[in-house]
Every structure is written in structure tokens, then in C-alpha cells.
């Protein structure tokens, strides 16, 4: 269980919380903020509780974030991205009270949560503002190239994956290019570590390899 759960946003009677796992002895100034996976449609912040506890046992504060998801809140990808940004900004605004160093926040996530994390560091908001303070990215089988979701769905994939692909396509509202971190690679991005399986059928390893190579070409550390 987390040491503390605090509401960072209330939308349409939905309480979105940040779940804090505090180390008994803080050995690092860093804080790790994580977003769960689930195709922007399902999943739960609870799924990261064990990872967060393991991280906190190493002396680092770890936070698992709620955000709105399609099958529970009837939302789209843009809403999930807005929540991720709101969660980060809330931590920054309350850093002093939370005893968090705002200059040492690492952001991470798995699958769709990896897209949310990378988006925070890479994609500008509606006012063309970019978050430049993020210390690093920790990405687990991340959805870094969402442009590929706009392809025609192959006939030979299993029904369950086909249905999920159709659902995700609807959630993007056509913004496959705009919401794809791979389209925002530039110099000066945070150092990143990416964990990805070579046999991943949902996100082929080639996508991750291209992203990594493109990042390195721009002088970023991956």
C-alpha cells in the first residue's frame, strides 16, 4: 500500500490521485512518477504499486498516477495526456510541501503509460509550451510511435487484438501523428532508459530501435 494518496485533479466527480511510496531512508533527491499501461482504455495505477514499493525500498520516492481511461471514464487519448500533464504540474506546484526536488523528477510508464511519460518531455501543450525540467525518462515497452496505429488493420491478426486496435484508433480522434513522441525528437531531451522485449507483437522492437537511434543522432542519451 502507498504511504499516501493525494487528489491532484477533480473532473466530473472523478477524483484522480497520486499514490506516494516513500522510502524509510531517502538515499536520492530523485522522484519517479509512473503511468500505468492499458491502451489508454483500461488498467490501473494499482498495477504499479509493487514496482513503486521496490523503488522506494532503494531510497527513492515513487509515485503511481491515476488518469482517465476510455472504458471507465468515456475519454480519449487527449484526456489521458492532459491528466498526465496535470499530475506532473501538481507535483511541481506542491513540491515544497511534498518534500520533492522539482529539478529531479524522473517520469516513466509502461505501454500507453510510456507514451504519456514521453509526451510530457517531448510534446508541447496547446500553448506550445514544453516541459524542460524533467530529469529523465524510464520507459517500459512504450508506445513511442503512434503513427503506425493509423495503418490498415491486417486481416491475419487475432480477433482480440483486432478489436483492441479498432478501439484505440477511435480514441486518437485522428491525432496519430500529433500524439506520437517519435515525431518530436530534438536535441536536449532528458536521458532515457527503455526496456523492451524482442518478441513483443504489440509494439515491434524495430520501432523502439528506430526511436533510440533517432534520439542518439540528435545527441540524446538512450
Language model region names:
Residues 1-222:
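Alpha/beta-hydrolase superfamily serine-hydrolase fold, recognizing
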Amino acid at each position: 500500500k502507498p504511504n499516501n494518496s493525494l487528489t491532484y485533479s477533480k473532473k466530473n466527480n472523478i477524483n484522480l490521485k497520486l499514490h506516494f511510496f516513500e522510502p524509510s531512508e531517502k538515499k536520492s533527491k530523485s522522484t519517479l512518477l509512473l503511468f500505468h499501461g492499458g491502451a489508454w482504455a483500461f488498467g490501473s495505477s494499482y498495477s504499479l504499486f509493487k514496482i513503486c514499493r521496490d523503488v522506494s525500498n532503494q531510497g527513492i520516492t515513487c509515485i503511481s498516477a491515476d488518469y482517465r481511461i476510455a472504458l471507465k471514464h468515456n475519454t480519449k487519448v487527449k484526456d489521458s495526456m492532459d491528466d498526465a500533464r496535470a499530475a506532473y504540474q501538481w507535483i511541481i506546484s506542491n513540491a515544497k510541501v511534498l518534500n520533492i526536488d522539482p529539478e529531479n523528477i524522473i517520469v516513466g510508464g509502461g505501454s500507453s503509460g510510456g507514451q504519456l511519460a514521453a509526451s510530457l518531455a517531448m510534446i508541447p501543450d496547446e500553448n506550445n509550451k514544453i516541459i524542460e525540467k524533467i530529469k529523465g525518462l524510464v520507459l517500459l515497452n512504450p508506445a513511442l510511435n503512434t503513427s503506425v496505429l493509423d495503418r490498415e488493420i491486417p486481416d491475419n491478426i487475432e480477433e482480440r487484438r483486432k478489436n483492441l486496435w479498432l478501439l484505440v484508433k477511435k480514441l486518437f480522434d485522428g491525432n496519430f501523428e500529433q500524439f506520437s513522441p517519435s515525431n518530436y525528437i530534438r536535441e536536449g531531451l532528458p536521458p532515457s532508459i527503455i526496456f523492451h522485449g524482442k518478441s513483443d507483437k504489440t509494439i515491434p522492437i524495430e520501432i523502439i530501435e528506430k526511436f533510440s537511434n533517432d534520439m542518439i543522432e540528435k545527441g540524446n542519451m538512450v
